[in-house]
């Protein structure tokens, strides 16, 4: 199906200007006038790509860790109304039994999406926030469930997910984390560092091993000090992505 969007403010060459767009099967095929089966008047609105939320624990009153299929549907529909068209399901550190249950529910929802989910954000995969995190900066994580890296456990989770665990948050100072990052990458996961009071050198070691992002930068993280740059200094000095809690 083709759609022509008219009168919207489109971001082009560094500025927003009123342009027309023609989309076919969800992809932009023209930034000029063109014929289409459907015309949408975006007057007074900005036209931007859908947002991709790589770290979210739910929405519309539904917690991912406790979500069933109806819950995942509710989250996806809510996100779509807010301009988020794709997302990762972030699983808080939980028991092995509950983590596997949540993984299976997420995978089931992904499979159901293949049959079409109108007005529902696309679930791209899973983000594991833990369990290889520092107790000192645990935030909302249950401390008794935080452990040192266990690649066999992670492999079991990834197999249950059918390879759909895309992203994992770890704390650099937890014993064994820097040495385990390449193993996590080999399992098909992007690695983020966070929930951490790591020193500058340890954080950089993780970045050099392949960590590509910082989880909710500034939050649950030791902040910059003139004599102790810590993880914050390494994150800001490097070229890794920085998540932000924007409220």
Q: For each of these PLM feature ranges, what is it?
A:
Residues 8, 26, 44, 55, ...:
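Divalent metal-coordination and catalytic microenvironments
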Residues 1-48:
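Histidine-rich, glycine-flanked metal-binding segment
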Residues 4-5, 22, 47, 53, ...:
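Conserved beta-strand segments that form the floor/walls of ligand-binding pockets within enzyme
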């Amino acid at each position: 199906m083709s759609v022509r969007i008219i009168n919207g403010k489109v971001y082009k060459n560094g500025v927003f200007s009123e342009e027309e767009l023609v989309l076919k099967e969800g992809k932009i095929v023209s930034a000029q006038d063109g014929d289409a089966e459907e015309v949408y008047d975006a007057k007074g609105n900005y036209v931007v790509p859908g947002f991709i939320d790589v770290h979210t624990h739910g929405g519309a009153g539904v917690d991912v860790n406790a979500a069933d299929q109806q819950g995942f549907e509710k989250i996806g529909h809510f996100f779509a109304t807010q301009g988020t068209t794709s997302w990762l399901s972030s699983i808080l550190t939980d028991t092995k039994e509950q983590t596997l249950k949540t993984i299976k529910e997420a995978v089931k929802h992904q499979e159901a999406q293949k049959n079409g989910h109108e007005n529902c954000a696309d679930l791209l995969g899973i983000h594991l926030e833990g369990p290889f995190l520092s107790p000192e900066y645990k935030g909302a994580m249950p401390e008794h469930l935080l452990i040192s890296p266990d690649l066999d456990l992670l492999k079991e989770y990834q197999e249950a997910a059918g390879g759909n665990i895309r992203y994992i948050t770890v704390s650099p100072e937890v014993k064994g984390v820097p040495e385990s990052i390449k193993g996590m990458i080999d399992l098909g996961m992007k690695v983020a560092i966070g929930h951490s009071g790591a020193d500058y050198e340890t954080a950089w070691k993780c970045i050099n091993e392949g960590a590509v992002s910082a989880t909710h930068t500034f939050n649950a993280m030791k902040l910059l000090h003139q004599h102790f740059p810590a993880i914050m200094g390494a994150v800001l000095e490097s070229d890794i992505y920085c998540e932000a809690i924007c409220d």
